[in-house]
Each structure stands twice: as structure tokens, then as C-alpha cells.
Amino acid sequence: MLQFITHCRGSHNEISGTRAVLEGGCRWVQLRMKDASESELLSVGRTVGELCRSFDAVFIVDDHVDLVEALGADGVHLGKNDMPVAEARKILGESKIIGATANTVADMCAAAESGADYIGLGPFRFTTTKERLSPVLGIGGYREAMAAFREKSDLPVVAIGGITAADIPA
């Protein structure tokens, strides 16, 4: 599964970037605006949510369990220092998607055991979007982690962190 995580870069902001990837065929968008105010997040989130719905794409909000319902999002993605998955599940219920960030096999197993619907494993390589970056995994680290995790779980895992269009086969 290809998951687009919004990031202001060059001529694209969250809205134009979302529109571009949806027009290109992506059907999973995570709205990530780490330094935005709640009002900005709501404003941009409403537009991104409408775009996702018009393309029948999954719309995930990063970190903000409290805004999932207000934005009509399909779910939330939680970092390792965010609200625990089990607590988010109690708030959102079983119908919402909850993703969790992991950097190790132990993190992956903990996310699976706590009720996450998918795992974002990373970072793949160095990224400028995180201040306190976990150890970079690279392709070798991903292969090792996935081999060990697949012995325990079949939960979907997506690669995150520093991935560019050049990493995606045409």
C-alpha cells in the first residue's frame, strides 16, 4: 500500500500535494502538520478530507485523536510518544483505523498487541521532518525486522521516513 504523508515542500502545500497524489492514483493520505495550530489543522484538514472522499481515498490524521470525528477522518496515526493505541481505541471505537509508529521488532509487536490496525516502520533513511530521529533502518534493517515480525503477526506494515518518489517503482 502506498501511503502519502503530507509535507510542505517546494511549490506544494498539504492541499496541493494531496490533490497531486490523489490524481496520480494514491488512495491513502495522512495529514501531518506538526507545528500547525488547531484552527489551521481544522481548516486544512476539512479540505484534505473532502479531497480524499472525492477520490474514495483513506484519510488519516497524524497524532490528533481529538480531531478525527470533527474532520470526518477514517482514523489516526500515532507516534511512539503520542497517546497509547489502546486509549485511542477506547475513544475512537473499532470502526476507525489506528496506525502506530515503530522502529524495532519489539515496537512492532507492542503495536500489534495494543490493537493497531497497521504499523509505520521507520525511518527508512534520514529525514528532515523529524527532530529526534530514531535509528535509520535502511533496506537491510527493514528486511530483518519484517522477517522477524512476520513470524509473529501479519499486520500491515508501511515503510516511513525519508522515502521519495525515486523509491517507488513506476
Q: Can you describe what each PLM-predicted range is?
A:
Residues 160:
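Short hydrophobic "strand-cap" motifs at the C-terminus of beta-strands
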Residues 129-131:
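Glycine/threonine-rich flexible loop motifs
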Residues 1-85, 90-118, 134, 144-147, ...:
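Conserved N-terminal beta1-alpha1 strand-loop-helix module at the mouth
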Residues 125-127:
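A short, flexible beta-alpha/helix-coil linker loop
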Residues 136-139:
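Short alpha-helical segments enriched in small residues
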